[in-house]
Swiss-Prot record:
KW Ubl conjugation (keyword) present: no
Positions contributing to GTP binding: 165-172, 190-194, 211-214, 280-283, 307-309
Enzyme class at the top of the EC tree: hydrolase
Protein known as: GTPase Obg
GO cellular component: cytoplasm
EC number: 3.6.5.-
Domain Obg: 2-158
Lineage, highest ranks first: Bacteria, Bacillati, Mycoplasmatota, Mycoplasmoidales, Metamycoplasmataceae
């Protein structure tokens, strides 16, 4: 059986955009051919898509670094570089992707591509920089880097119905009887270590059902399999509480109260969810006696009597669950953020920051400056002049002069180092 993993950190790196090209038309009988350097292709994106056959994030343990293909650089004759190939990753339904504590994607639909990392924009070729004043520009741009970050991947099983109960209450037997699931069944506790998903068909209708591993007292505090599985109940529309009413060594009242307490103690108070109580193991002799005791203490709780092993009343239970889902169809699944609420603030970050490292050394940084350095390669005189003009336009040179920069001083702009001249 696959190990159940429902939270993992991975690196995502979308493709870099292809570089633009510097090229000039060179053909026989064509005098003074103009610029024909093409643009680079966009970098590949990374998408997540739901796979109903998956119920664990185990695959990310084997591959914690996911990348997409880079875009191809532009070519001569105005040829555009090809777009980088997208990477599509199959994940369980109910997978959430977090970046810096903010939800990037919530995989809640089938057959839908969820963008989790965007590829970088391709650089422009020199054909795009032709003007009446510069008919032969030796200017091109680098492709921009694709989005890269450490993603926190969290799985919260997405199902119409969630089965809960103490170990060995018969949940696995019931999901097998109700659906197409093939959950492991045995006469010992904690047979279910991985949530099992099944599809229940009721005439022309269907709904999904999840068998969640058995809970024990203190689960809401993390005991046993604990809180790891309680969070999966958050995303179920309806909770079916299975109680063993037939075994001689089980007290159904205590069993019922123990689970209700754990559901109530969880941070979202899961007892507020629509809930059905199912009394299992009606084929055993002690069943009727326990039913009477339970009804005496909880006369207002409606219970559904079944034997999952013998399929007694299972078809009727399918109908009851469907009708219950229909009654609660107006309720929306509440998606709670496991992390701190992010407050959106206006970004007052300046275009650039100047630091005086010593008497003759100035350092220029900033998000806009970094983007400029990445975009413009200093490999031709025209590119250098463009780089210089943009810095001048946004006020970097004026700011350096106000900081009393002198001829010969060093100006460091990320990987570039220049010597200051009096006239720029």
């Amino acid at each position: 059986m696959a190990k159940f993993i429902d939270q993992v950190k991975i690196m995502l790196k979308a493709g870099k955009g292809g570089d633009g090209m510097i090229s000039f038309r060179r053909e026989a009988h064509v005098d003074k051919g103009g610029p024909d350097g093409g643009d680079g292709g966009t970098g590949g994106n990374i998408y997540f898509v739901a796979d109903l056959g998956k119920n664990t994030l185990l695959s990310f343990y084997k591959n914690k670094f996911i990348i997409a293909e880079d875009g191809v650089k532009g070519g001569p004759k105005n040829l555009y570089g090809a777009k980088g190939k997208d990477t599509i990753v199959k994940v369980p339904l109910g997978t959430l992707v977090y970046k810096n504590k903010k939800i990037v994607a919530d995989v809640i639909k089938e057959n839908h591509l969820y963008l989790v990392a965007k590829g970088g924009k391709g650089g422009r070729g020199n054909n795009k920089f032709k003007t009446s004043k510069n008919t032969a520009p030796r200017i091109a741009e680098n492709g921009m880097p694709g989005e890269k970050y450490e993603a926190n991947i969290v799985l919260k099983i997405l199902s119409d119905v969630g089965l809960v109960g103490l170990p060995s209450c018969g949940k696995s037997t019931l999901i097998n009887a109700l659906s197409n699931a093939k959950a492991k069944v045995a006469e010992y506790e904690f047979t279910t270590l991985v949530p099992q998903l099944g599809l229940v068909k009721y005439y022309d209708y269907s709904y999904t059902i999840a068998d969640l591993p058995g809970l024990i007292k203190g689960a809401s505090l993390g005991k046993g399999l604990g809180i790891q599985f309680l969070r999966h109940i958050e995303r179920c529309k309806v909770v079916i509480h299975i109680v063993d009413f037939g075994s001689l060594d089980k007290d159904p009242i205590q069993s019922y109260e123990a689970i209700q307490k754990e559901l109530e103690s969880y941070k979202l108070n899961l007892t507020q969810k629509p809930q059905l109580v199912v009394a299992n193991k009606s084929d055993l002799a002690n069943f009727k006696n326990n039913i009477e005791k339970f009804k005496a203490k909880y006369p207002n709780i409606e219970i559904i009597e079944i034997s999952a092993l013998n399929y007694h009343n299972v078809e009727n239970l399918k109908k009851i669950i469907w009708e219950f889902l229909e009654k609660t169809s107006h309720l929306q699944i509440k998606i709670e953020d496991d992390f701190e609420t992010e407050v959106k603030e206006i970004n007052y970050e300046p275009d650039f920051v100047i630091q005086k490292m010593n008497q003759n050394h100035f350092k220029v940084t900033g998000k806009k400056i970094e983007e400029l350095v990445l975009k413009i390669p200093i490999n031709t005189f025209d590119n250098l002049m463009r780089f210089n003009n943009i810095l001048k336009k946004i006020g970097v040179w004026e700011a350096l002069i106000k900081r009393d920069i002198q001829k010969g001083d060093l100006v460091e702009i990320y990987q570039h180092k220049f010597e200051w001249e009096e006239e720029l």
